[in-house]
Amino acid sequence: MKHIFRATLACALSYSGYGQTDGATRADWPHYGGSQLSWRFSALDQINASNIKALAPAWIFQTGDYAEGLQATPIVVDGVMYLITARAQVFALDASNGKVLWQHRYPPPRPGVAGGLSEVQESRGLTVGFGLVFFGSSDNHLVALDQKTGREVWNVAADDPKQCGCGISAAPLLVKDKVIIGGNGGDQAHRGYLTAFYAKTGRLAWRWYVIPGAGEKGNETWKGDSWKFGGGAPWMTGSYDPALNLVYWGTGNAASDFYDGARAPSADKSKETNLYTASVVALEADTGKLRWHYQEVPDDLWDFDSSYEVILMDREVRGRMRQLLAHMSKSGLTFVLDRTTGEFLGVFSVPEVRNWISGVTEDGKLVGRNEPKPGQLADFCPSPAGAKSWNSMAYSPRTGLLYAPINEVCAALRPTDEAPQEGHSFMNSSMDFKPAPGRVNYSHLDAWDPISGKRVWSYPYKYILLASVLATAGDLVFTGDPEGDFIALNARTGDKIWSYQTGAGHRGSAMSYSVGGRQFIATPSGWQMGLVGGLVRLFPDLQVRGGSTVVAFALPEAAR
């Protein structure tokens, strides 16, 4: 069952224009996802299908920090671009010409300071507010710099990285007077959490643990004391609805990743298991209190966590606007929920090759689970790298479509039963990637109608796509590929209408802004290996180049 959606809802929906404040209608790109709604949409339309062939580099900036490429989304506020490299070097640039205004070098973590994955430095974003620039570090600190000078103003430890094995790779989310951040280490033997700090001082405001403690509601979904080491870290950036005053986050997988003998209290896989892992949660922004949850993958045995972006949209239903969210997990299942209550409204599956389940019922239950077994070789599709990686999809209110890069890669692994060691990797398996069978192209950038669950168009690509998508009011969709091509597609048809070779593979996120009435499209360029190195090795003829460059494109005056 590839497309599952309640027909009565789908037939009752119509698109009525922007309807809702997208937060990126002005010249700036102030948040990781463009706005707090996480659309990755720019309302600027100076660059469009009629003139894009004239689009050319306006300026290029080399960070000089090439380790792990450039994975971030640049932020632009009041004509200044703020950028962080994978190793947490922060730059402020004149967004009109790329000139460096200041630079801050965050010291690398000492060897052995963390218990595992957090020793890999891969900062993916920052945010700006209250005259400060906020970012997280691989040694699990949240840092605030002076926005004008780059001087450190405050620095707080979210937790002891040596104990939890965790760090911070995602961009923080600024909500009112607080900065909210999760942490990586979803595969570590620790208890994941979201933390809010007061933006001006760094003082702790609240902390919400993904896994309920002893005596708390939901703890009964864990076996014994496995909740203490159950992972679930929300390792990407969330969203915020100011009208409801709720933050929305996707949570990580349960640990250990591929074996549940120590953590699943029941063999009944139709029930919620290991709450609140592999879920979308809504929390009260002021207190961190859980308002509602929806678990997408109960008893996750495939490392199919739900940590990706949560896209908030208002759509007309039976003559009235309904407040929705769309969320894609690593599995490629895309859920549409009522964001006020968490009510399930529909789900559709995006990968073309899928064998981890046989389908989904009309009420969102997984059926035909193909579960890895200890000591046995398991093959399943998509792989734990995800049908979509952490790089974000986009939503255009002009077309009403979601745009997502999808990869067709499978995995082979053999789970083991091992005891947890606090703060250390708790995956309990080695893993090999495999090309999905019967394929010529191993990825595709798709446009999906989130209401009907139907694919509107698909742009095929021979290898893998691991960069975010940008949609604009010029009815354009931008992304980059590992060979270094930065491309633009027609948002309504999927036709490729422009490209530029940047010289290095794309792993980060393009964005758009305006300075002095001139629209820019900026993209990071620079490949990161890490886990995706295993994906690249599937394609011996794929030549991937590293780098750490921002290329900002604009139209010449005659074409504007």
Where are these regions (language model features)?
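Extracytoplasmic beta-rich repeat domains
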Residues: 61-73, 103-127, 152-171, 188, ...
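Beta-propeller blade signature
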Residues: 145-150, 192-204, 267-288, 337-342, ...
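Loop/turn-rich, solvent-exposed surfaces of beta-rich toroidal or solenoidal domains
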Residues: 314, 406-408, 437-495
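Phosphate/diphosphate-binding loops
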Residues: 311-351, 355-356, 372-383, 388, ...
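Blade-level signature of beta-propeller repeat domains, shared across WD40, Kelch, NHL, RCC1
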Residues: 511-560
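Blade/loop signatures of beta-propeller domains
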Residues: 20-57, 210-217, 366-370, 434-435, ...
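N-terminal cofactor/phosphate-binding cores enriched in small/glycine residues
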Residues: 41-159, 471-472
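Repeat-blade elements of multi-bladed beta-propeller folds
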Residues: 29-33, 69-89, 115-142, 165-191, ...
